[in-house]
Curated annotation (Swiss-Prot):
Gene symbol of the encoding locus: thrB
Organism, scientific name: Pyrococcus abyssi (strain GE5 / Orsay)
Similarity comment: Belongs to the GHMP kinase family. Homoserine kinase subfamily.
Name of this chain's protein: Homoserine kinase
Pfam families for the chain: GHMP_kinases_C (PF08544), GHMP_kinases_N (PF00288)
Known EC number: 2.7.1.39
Length: 294
């Protein structure tokens, strides 16, 4: 019997929470139709991603089979709705969908096993099994990753409206991770700790203006901006249009903003991209549910 799985896109880092904060959004997402098979097969619709066993959905599905010691496989039909190299957790969504596809076939309902399998797909895509896309895509909402081993995740109950602006440029995740130094100045680490702690409190209190003010980062963004030379100008356009805060989603190039008039903010940022010779699109979305099957 065929089973369907949907895994949403995500906003990782969420300002100062490098590799720790992540929020699912309502759209876009990846959908998988899966059925049991003697081997691992995949068909892909939508964005161009590997159509063989190098696809992260297959890697994650295989990982779960191996973890539980089962033979066999799955046939996956992936409707790829999250653009690769967009900063919206494309590989994370496919990895979650693939791991859940295997879980539905195998009858596995252990969250930690499914997440660990999905992280194998994320590792293959980005070079690092970071969980700030996989975990919010799986659980939904706003998540704080305390640790992966053992898996400890904290969730903040929040419904946040955001505008996402996606330019027609790519920032490969592996390159965006490589460019971040292993060590940063102590003052930058202290600043990020202060911003991250304050942002969580502001989210819990519903203080969206303060959340916006804290959408900044001293650990990764100063280095990643070298891959996004347009960032400062587009951010300024969003702030001038009334945004409380604007920053990068994940490793970029997508940006997100919060504020009162999200349509005006998105339009201003899109127009600034176009002034710089870069096509872009924007859409308004909000905190999303996690992966689901039906």
């Amino acid at each position: 019997m065929k089973k369907r799985i949907y895994a949403p896109a995500t906003i990782a880092n969420f300002g100062p929470g490098f590799d720790v904060f992540g929020m699912a959004i309502e759209e876009p997402g990846d959908e998988v139709i899966v059925k049991e098979s003697d081997s691992f097969e995949i068909e892909v619709e939508g964005y161009d991603v590997p159509r063989d066993e190098n696809n992260v959905a297959v890697i994650s599905a295989k990982a779960l089979f191996k973890m539980v010691g089962e033979e066999g496989g799955v046939k996956i039909r992936l409707k790829k709705g999250v653009r690769p190299k967009s900063g919206l957790g494309s590989s994370g969504a496919s990895s979650v969908a693939g791991a859940l596809a295997a879980a539905r076939v195998l009858g596995v309902d252990n969250d930690e096993l499914i997440i660990m399998a999905a992280l194998e797909g994320e590792k293959a895509a980005s070079g690092s099994p970071h969980g700030d896309n996989v975990i919010p895509s799986y659980y939904g909402g706003f998540n704080i990753l305390e640790s992966l081993n053992p898996l400890r995740v904290h969730r903040v109950d929040v419904e946040l409206n955001v505008v996402v602006v996606l330019p027609e440029v790519e920032v490969p995740t592996k390159e965006a991770r490589r460019i971040v130094p292993e060590k940063v100045p102590l003052k930058d680490a202290i600043k990020n700790l202060a911003m991250a702690s304050s942002l969580v409190l502001a989210l819990k209190e519903g203080d969206i203006e303060t959340v916006g003010r804290l959408l900044d980062d001293n650990l990764a963004l100063p280095y990643r901006k070298k891959l996004m030379p347009w960032f400062d100008e587009v951010r300024k356009a969003g702030l001038e249009a009334g945004a409380y805060g604007v920053t990068v989603s994940g490793s970029g190039p997508s940006l997100f903003a919060i504020g009162e008039n999200l349509k005006d903010i998105g339009k201003a940022m899109k127009e600034k991209f176009e002034e710089l010779g870069i096509r872009a699109e924007f859409w308004i979305t909000k905190t999303g549910r996690g992966a689901k099957w039906y």
